[in-house]
């Protein structure tokens, strides 16, 4: 990489850090190309990204961002993963760490809050934003569904009573 490419890479990474809500730092020492490719595919499916970056370039990109506290974690062969959905990137990273012992979580940051590896694991246990939205929608719709059922019940009962009277009148007439 020449200087212009490095500057462009740092600028791209800084732009990512300005827009994202969660960054996870991991050790990627000993991972095969197939492992990294599989991890990238899983990250993309979850709406996250995974990138191996030189620590010095990552340091430069982190300067002045809310993730500035990640700098001490950037030692040795590290990689960064990020996403708008904080739970998605944490879940993929934790699940991959369970299946691949060479992938080690170092920590991360959620906004300005720095997390160690156990903090990232705890975050991975939370429901995702989509799951929370579905639960909230279900909670909002449940009362309306119950009210509609209650309002329809008397009308249905009244219709059954009229039908019973009609059958009784037909039976008496016959």
UniProtKB/Swiss-Prot annotation:
GO terms for molecular function: large ribosomal subunit rRNA binding; structural constituent of ribosome. SUPFAM superfamilies: Ribosomal protein L10-like. It comes from the Bacteria. Keywords: Ribonucleoprotein, Ribosomal protein, RNA-binding, rRNA-binding. PROSITE patterns: RIBOSOMAL_L10. Pfam families: Ribosomal_L10. Part of the ribosomal stalk of the 50S ribosomal subunit. The N-terminus interacts with L11 and the large rRNA to form the base of the stalk. The C-terminus forms an elongated spine to which L12 dimers bind in a sequential fashion forming a multimeric L10(L12)X complex. Belongs to the universal ribosomal protein uL10 family. Forms part of the ribosomal stalk, playing a central role in the interaction of the ribosome with GTP-bound translation factors. NCBIfam families: PRK00099.1-1. This is Large ribosomal subunit protein uL10. It comes from Acidiphilium cryptum (strain JF-5). The gene is rplJ.
